[in-house]
Amino acid sequence: MLRISARFYCKIATQSSFKAAEYKNKIKKDKKLNFTQLLHPTKVPQTPVPAAFSDPSENVVEIDTKTIQLLERLSLVDLDSDQALATLKSSIQFADKIAHIDTQNVRPLYTVLEKQQLQLRNDQVTAGDSRAELLRCAKVTDEDYYVSPPGNIPLEQ
């Protein structure tokens, strides 16, 4: 039997006589979290945060043909068109902007499922020999392995 306990990953604004056990019992009864009790109910800033980005036209990305060929081989994507190269260059510029954002004084985020209790199913013991049943789910198999298409290239029928 698994023991499920509620863990709190954020501070709750309460009086000093607050007891965690009382709050856990209250949460179990209510089944809903009262966001007004949290010191920081959201991690989304209430006001815009100024950020200094350089002009994208200043950072012109030049990619040599050897790098383009390597990317085509690794990603199985054709980069011969001008539109594909423009998309690749803008993606690199965007990643460069993100890499230069100052995150020195930014605290890590809480978990997405901060106060939600996840329902767990009961464990069921099986014989464990269900290989044939699992392989029947796949469209294409080879010996005892799944066969998947390599990237965006379809398998021959």
UniProtKB/Swiss-Prot annotation:
This is Glutamyl-tRNA(Gln) amidotransferase subunit C, mitochondrial. Its main location: mitochondrion. It holds the Pfam family GatC. It comes from the Eukaryota. SUPFAM superfamilies: Glu-tRNAGln amidotransferase C subunit. Belongs to the GatC family. GO terms for biological process: glutaminyl-tRNAGln biosynthesis via transamidation; mitochondrial translation; regulation of translational fidelity. One of its GO terms (cellular component) is mitochondrion. It is an enzyme of class 6 (ligase). It comes from Drosophila virilis (Fruit fly). This protein may be expected to contain an N-terminal transit peptide but none has been predicted. Subunit of the heterotrimeric GatCAB amidotransferase (AdT) complex, composed of A, B and C subunits. Its EC number is 6.3.5.-. Keywords: ATP-binding, Ligase, Mitochondrion, Nucleotide-binding, Protein biosynthesis. NCBIfam families: gatC (TIGR00135). Allows the formation of correctly charged Gln-tRNA(Gln) through the transamidation of misacylated Glu-tRNA(Gln) in the mitochondria. The reaction takes place in the presence of glutamine and ATP through an activated gamma-phospho-Glu-tRNA(Gln). One of its GO terms (molecular function) is ATP binding. It catalyses: L-glutamyl-tRNA(Gln) + L-glutamine + ATP + H2O = L-glutaminyl-tRNA(Gln) + L-glutamate + ADP + phosphate + H(+). It is found in: Mitochondrion. InterPro entries: Asp/Glu-ADT_sf_sub_c, GatC. The keyword Protease does not apply.
